[in-house]
Amino acid sequence: MKKSLIALTLAALPVAAMADVTLYGQVKAGVEVSRTKETVNHVSTKNKTATEIADFGSRIGFKGHEHLSNNLNAIWQVEQNTSVAGTDKGWGTRESFIGLEGGFGKVRAGKLNTALKDNSDSVDPWESSDANASVLQFGKLKRVDERKVSVRYDSPVFAGFSASAQYQPRDNANPEDKHVHDVKTRHSFDLGLNYENSGFFGRYAGTFAKRKVLSDDHLELFNSNTTLGSGVYKDYQAHRLVGGYDANNVLVSVAGQYEGFKADVADAKKNERTEVAVTGGYRMGNVMPRLSYAHGFKAKENGVKQGNSQYNQVIVGADYDFSKRTSALVSAGWLKEGKGGDKTQSTAGLVGLRHKF
């Protein structure tokens, strides 16, 4: 009898050791079609319609915790992209961290979402491939979203209010300069403030960097007709306010965003842009139809407003839930940048499937 009890205890030990580990993820993909029409000096040209099987951001992750003492836990997560097209590789390519959580809130270190990235879902619930994210998602608005190798503190919730603060050291922002420090620091700070009560919510997110590298892709999303080139810019900042209501089958969300930065030279003038977006939806049984609209006001480059830099975007679609885990997706998007005889119009649509586990 004693031997049987010992054997049962030993057999249960691996199960107990793994009890705090959770495997989770999403598999989502479908068919996308897209096309672009460009007008220059009132002469229009269209490219061929592209039709492709596309991954919509499939991912897999492992997370867990260990109880250390009264009201204190060790927490960890490792998450990575896993495209159904087999194009992703590597571990920890998404939010991955280790940290401590207790009555004080939580402190984490690793590759972490910024507050800006965290609050995007409040106004942009859409799915698509990266290639069509600027049409089928608010890709232009979300150009400021990042994950940074950093340390982040999240406060507990007090009467509906919570906050976060995040810091990326200079040698994580620019690892090629480590131990040398030949160039000026590119460390950054991120802040988040949130409020939720009875379905109503308000969220602020901001990022600040004395100097920051901006890529050609980022600058093209900033202004598709930009005169700016990739490189280091100074006094970088981005701010987003999101407010709305999400309860009782109703979703209404409004966002406003500002981004500003200067060339890293003396007496440089600001490059800046202001954008707004709104999303509405109403659940009817298993169906959640939604409609979104975004507008980008004219961008300023070197302090001068850029003609034909404004944009308008519309996304319409619906999710149909087969179950709590599996949903069918359908959406269509339209993006117009510029106006009159000089403009670019992009259209795209998708039909797909999403499964969460």
Curated annotation (Swiss-Prot):
Pfam families per UniProt: Porin_1 (PF00267)
Topology with respect to the bilayer: Multi-pass membrane protein
Range of residues in the leader sequence: 1-19
GO cellular component: cell outer membrane; pore complex
Family matches, as InterPro entries: Gram-neg_bact_OMP, Gram_neg_porin_domain, Porin_dom_sf, Porin_Gram-ve, Porin_Gram-ve_CS, Porin_Neis
Keyword annotations: Cell outer membrane, Ion transport, Membrane, Porin, Signal, Transmembrane, Transmembrane beta strand, Transport
Subcellular localization: Cell outer membrane
Top-level taxon in the UniProt lineage: Bacteria
GO molecular function: porin activity
Entry's Gene Ontology BP terms: monoatomic ion transmembrane transport
Family membership: Belongs to the Gram-negative porin family.
Function of the protein: Serves as a slightly cation selective porin.
Assembly and oligomerization: Homotrimer.
NCBIfam families named in the record: porin_porB_Neis
Protein name per the record: Major outer membrane protein P.IB
Origin species: Neisseria sicca
Gene: por
